[in-house]
Amino acid sequence: MPSFDTPEPISVTAHVEAGSIQFTAGDGPATVVDVRPRDPKRDQDVRTAGQTGVTYAGGTLTVRTPKLGLLGRTGTVDVTVGLPVGSHAEVTGAWLQVFGEGRLGEVRVKTSSGDVRLDTTGPLKLTASHGSITVDRVEGAAEIATSSGSVRVGLVDGPAVLKNSHGTTSVEEARGDLRVSGANGDILIARAEGSVTATAANGTLRVAEVSRGTVQLETSYGAIEVGVREGTAAWLDVSSDSGQVRNTLSASKAPEESADTVKIRARTRFGNIDVRRARP
């Protein structure tokens, strides 16, 4: 079990062809790496674990499983990395699950298949072809994309771009401008402090609370629902080709210059549109 003295945050570059990698960020003065075969009785897993390289130099930890054999076979390993809070991580893999506990710094992940679950990160760039993605908190900008699977983000404290071809996408709170796009799947945003652009070919679009900026929502098949924060004036441009448009906001005079305003543009071909005050 390799261990390195690391009193300050470090950078990690890891490539795991198949298996999992878990980062645990803590206050300890050392970085500890453990590589284990997924199945201790499977020779390929044991061989891959034994051939996985772990090195540390110049503030960078490198973890790399061996290249695929001539027959394209590889073993499955589980890697754990205990490291200082605020450390950066760049992870790639084919069939790989990625987990993060504690507060990491900037994180970049690219996998072909596998779930990703992270507690807190700095700026985040995450790409997965297949797999569910869960991130509790992003302290900075976020770029997340998956071809198939759910995407759930707690708080994003910066601008964010989320792309999900097939699956539900949900955001609890976005403090910067937010762009979400999908082909098939609902888009659910609980609270947006900035502008929002959300588009889907087939899915419901719901933004529970907006307070300022521009909100642009468009879906071909699905309902649209927008909640406007109390005290915020709203300019509306909404239409449905086949469905009802319901606006329960009370008409008012032009807002004062100091008042928060939001411009809402919503379009759906098949589905209802509801605009109301946000529920407390």
What do the PLM-derived regions correspond to, one by one?
Residues 1-280:
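Intrinsically disordered, low-complexity terminal regions
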